[in-house]
A protein has these predicted regions:
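Glycine-rich segments within core transmembrane alpha-helices of 12-TM secondary carriers
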Residues: 61-66, 148-167
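Hydrophobic core of transmembrane alpha-helices in multi-pass small-molecule transporters
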Residues: 24-28, 103-107, 113-130
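Loop-to-transmembrane helix entry/capping segments in MFS-fold secondary transporters
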Residues: 49-55, 144-154
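Structural signature of the two symmetry-related core transmembrane helices
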Residues: 87-105
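Intracellular juxtamembrane helix-capping segments at the cytosolic ends
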Residues: 38, 129-142
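Helix-loop boundary and gating motifs at the non-cytosolic
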Residues: 4-62
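Residue-level signal for discrete positions within transmembrane alpha-helices
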Residues: 27, 62, 101, 124, ...
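Central cavity-lining transmembrane alpha-helices of secondary-active solute carriers
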Residues: 55-78
């Protein structure tokens, strides 16, 4: 049987700061590669077909992100095995975030377009686990009267993350 938490139990100290930093990081994880880094890698890996190669890579990554978003939402909604004070979605974020980092790191060293494409698609799966679950973790953790504050944090850190990812 699930225990319904009170408003005081649902709002951990410093949650809003941690949430903002985490969401900022999740945006930088895809904004930097998509807007700057992958294009530069195409110039190196496929100079004669860089535009077509980048388009293919982004299309495959985008399709992976769409499908992954559906799967990650489904998986998180059925995570009955680790419901705690921080909800059932935060553990997915904590598991996937390091995998995003490892995937991006490996992408920077790949000498092959197809390996890069595979890694980018894998990173998209992990980014979906991080971003989608961060977007919905508020339902588990934050009292309803603070949803507007969290929405403002998402808007600010999203914009700042895009700028930071391309700077």
């Amino acid at each position: 049987m699930l225990h319904t938490l009170t408003a005081a139990e649902r709002e951990p100290k410093l949650f809003f700061w941690k949430f903002g930093i985490a969401f900022f990081g999740s945006v930088i994880a895809w904004a930097g590669p998509t807007q700057l880094l992958l294009g530069l890698q195409m110039i190196e890996l496929r100079p004669d077909s860089k535009e077509e190669s980048l388009a293919l890579l982004m299309m495959l990554g985008g399709a992976t992100a769409v499908v992954s978003s559906l799967i990650t939402g489904y998986a998180a909604d059925r995570s009955w095995f680790w419901v705690n004070r921080w909800g059932k979605r935060l553990p997915w974020v904590l598991l996937a975030a390091p995998l995003v980092t490892v995937g991006l790191f490996l992408m920077s060293f790949t000498p092959s377009f197809w390996v890069l494409t595979g890694l980018w698609c894998l990173v998209q799966v992990f980014v979906a686990f991080v971003t989608n679950n961060l977007m919905t973790v508020t339902a588990d953790v934050v009292p309803q009267e603070k949803f507007g504050l969290v929405s403002g944090i998402v808007g600010a850190t999203y914009t700042f993350g895009i700028v930071g990812g391309t700077a």
